[in-house]
């Protein structure tokens, strides 16, 4: 991996800078390096468990034109459980992700306090799901969505005005003319990080081709493509070389778009003058509340979550 030294410190060391917080849950660095006993840890070794690639810092989105929505008040995860937004809230129907959106909301609203928000106990899962099921019965949640495309359709159809929303949906909604924004929660973002692994059975030319593929992901071009839907890549400067100055300024540097910008398909999605919520990459990466994590009690969580969405 000749470009390993260019991979962002966010994944190689755990934070983007000395003043940044690592966040609760399984920060990628904690399971990145393979040790001599085959365990995974943050201690650097010559072996990695995966090649860190695409990542982002998620929050919730809102339609600025929806009745009763005030952008000035959308600064806390607590808004997802705000009685004033009764019947307008959507949550992603993926327990390993949606649980963090609602846990951050419950804690920010002062309704619950968790020992470790990245790894809830059975009792904490029960208490949180009981609260959510009650809110659902009262009509607080308007819907639960399964895919980014479905979320886009639901917000376009005015099924919800506030809720879980990912960057591809934000880009697609902006392309449709919806005045949607992602919140910048004071509590921090829910972060996630993808990566690529190799099968231990690869040999010869197959293994060489697999390494060529991994290195291609670090070449910069793939990162430029995913940047146009709001995602970040672990080799920041490589990506910069494949974006126009205007694209780099908007997607990574946090500046206002100096011209209309395309999505990955080439269709205009970002209009001139727009500013990305949360600002620059380094600012967003410094404000992580929790990482997407498969909790110790994941199986129990899935069963309880099913009661919520059924």
Spans of features found by a protein language model:
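Extracytoplasmic/periplasmic substrate-binding proteins
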Residues: 140-203, 247
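Conserved C-terminal helix/tail region of periplasmic/extracytoplasmic solute-binding proteins
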Residues: 265-310
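Loop/turn elements at helix/coil->beta-strand transitions in domains of secreted/extracellular proteins
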Residues: 28-30, 85-88, 137-140, 157-161, ...
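Non-transmembrane alpha-helical segments in soluble domains
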Residues: 78-81, 103, 129-133, 152, ...
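A bilobed periplasmic-binding-protein/Venus flytrap-type ligand-binding module shared by bacterial periplasmic
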Residues: 59-67, 105, 193-206, 225-226
């Amino acid at each position: 991996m000749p470009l390993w030294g260019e991979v962002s410190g966010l994944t190689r060391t755990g934070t983007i800078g000395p003043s940044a917080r690592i966040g609760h849950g399984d920060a990628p660095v904690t399971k990145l390096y393979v040790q001599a006993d085959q365990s995974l840890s943050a201690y650097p070794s010559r072996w990695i468990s995966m090649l860190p690639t695409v990542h982002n810092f998620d929050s919730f989105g809102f339609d600025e034109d929806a009745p009763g929505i005030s952008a000035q008040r959308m600064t806390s995860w607590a808004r997802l459980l705000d009685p004033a937004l009764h019947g307008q809230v959507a949550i992603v129907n993926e327990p390993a992700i949606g649980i963090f959106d609602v846990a951050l909301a419950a804690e920010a609203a002062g309704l619950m306090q968790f020992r470790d928000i990245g790894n809830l106990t059975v009792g904490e899962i029960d208490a949180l799901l009981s609260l959510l099921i009650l809110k659902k019965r009262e009509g607080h949640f308007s819907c639960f969505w399964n895919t980014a495309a479905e979320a886009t359709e639901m917000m376009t159809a005015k099924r919800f005005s506030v809720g879980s929303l990912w960057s591809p949906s934000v880009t697609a909604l902006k392309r449709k003319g919806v005045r949607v924004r992602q919140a910048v929660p004071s509590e921090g973002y829910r972060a996630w990080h993808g990566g690529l692994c190799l099968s231990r059975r690869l040999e010869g030319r197959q293994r060489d081709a697999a390494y060529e593929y991994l290195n291609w992901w670090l070449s910069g071009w793939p990162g430029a493509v995913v940047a146009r839907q709001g995602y970040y890549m672990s080799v920041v400067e490589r990506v910069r070389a494949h974006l126009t100055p205007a694209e780099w300024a908007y997607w990574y540097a946090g500046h206002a778009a100096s011209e209309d910008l395309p999505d990955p398909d080439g269709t205009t999605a970002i209009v001139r003058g727009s500013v990305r919520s949360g600002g620059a990459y380094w600012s967003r990466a410094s404000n992580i509340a929790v990482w997407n994590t498969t909790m110790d009690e994941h199986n129990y969580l899935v069963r309880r979550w099913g009661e919520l969405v059924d």
